[in-house]
Design a protein with these regions (language model features):
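Soluble ligand-binding/transfer domains with enclosed cavities or grooves
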Residues: 1-162
Length: 162
């Protein structure tokens, strides 16, 4: 993944290169089962849960001196209708805390994910340009004033291992 981030509040630009892995959870993954139980989600949802892990290198170097960060999040989609629902995340996209996000799938296949935290909200848009090329954009706003704090755009190329 190659992502550019624009922090409007700090008038900064960030370039990030990431390795992202998305995989379905295993039915016996103890971390996922605990996450489901802690959030009062039926353990039948373990079949829908998936894991996202990432390793990123950034120019800003916020995480440590060499600018590397990594992490993992459990995501559990809860369908409300064919095109809408919730995603319970163990770690959010913008804040490193648990969050319940709303999602909507548009007619063209674009996935919109809306997350609210204590003082900010984020809207992500994810769409596939081809089978192996995904684009993602996000806008982070202040909940108080709705001022735009940050925008980002990512191109993510699927790596197929043989």
């Amino acid at each position: 993944s190659m992502r550019s981030g624009h922090s409007l509040a700090f008038q900064e630009f960030e370039e990030i290169r990431s390795k992202i892995k998305i995989s379905p959870s295993k039915p016996n993954d103890a971390r996922v089962i605990k996450f489901l139980k802690d959030n009062l989600i039926t353990t039948k949802a373990v079949n829908k849960a998936f894991l996202i892990s990432w390793e990123a290198k950034s120019e800003w170097g916020e995480e440590n001196q060499n600018g590397n960060s990594s992490g993992e999040s459990i995501l559990v989609p809860i369908e409300v209708s064919k095109t809408e629902g919730k995603i319970v995340r163990s770690v959010g996209y913008t804040e490193a805390i648990q969050v319940v996000s709303l999602y909507k799938i548009l007619g063209d296949g674009t996935l919109i994910i809306y997350s609210e935290y204590s003082h900010i909200c984020t809207e992500e848009r994810i769409w596939f340009i081809s089978n192996n090329l995904r684009s993602r954009s996000s806008v982070t706003r202040s909940l108080d004033s709705l001022a735009i704090l940050q925008t980002s755009y990512a191109s993510e190329i699927r790596s197929l291992k043989k």
